[in-house]
Amino acid sequence: MDLSQLRQQIDTIDRQIVDLYEERMDVSRQVAEYKIETGKKVFDKQREQEKIAGVKALTHNDFNSHGVEELFEQIMSMSRKLQYQLLAAHGSEGRLPF
């Protein structure tokens, strides 16, 4: 493969990543609605620690493990941010113990 083909392959993967990110944020919106209805906290430290451990276990080397950890910490941070925004917009911010 030449450089152009490799870059095209990366571009395709990047589009897939964006699509999956948007899909994940859509599910995060649904999670926020559930939390609004049930009064659950946005931040669940145990769940996030379990999630990080789980995705790191899917990697094949230390470099990728560290990268996946950083990636998912950022993704979960953005998910929390979205959930907080939705909770605030819904007027639930003062009623939920988060």
Task: Map each language-model feature to its residues.
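Domain-level signature for soluble enzymes in the chorismate/prephenate branch of the shikimate pathway
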Residues: 1-98
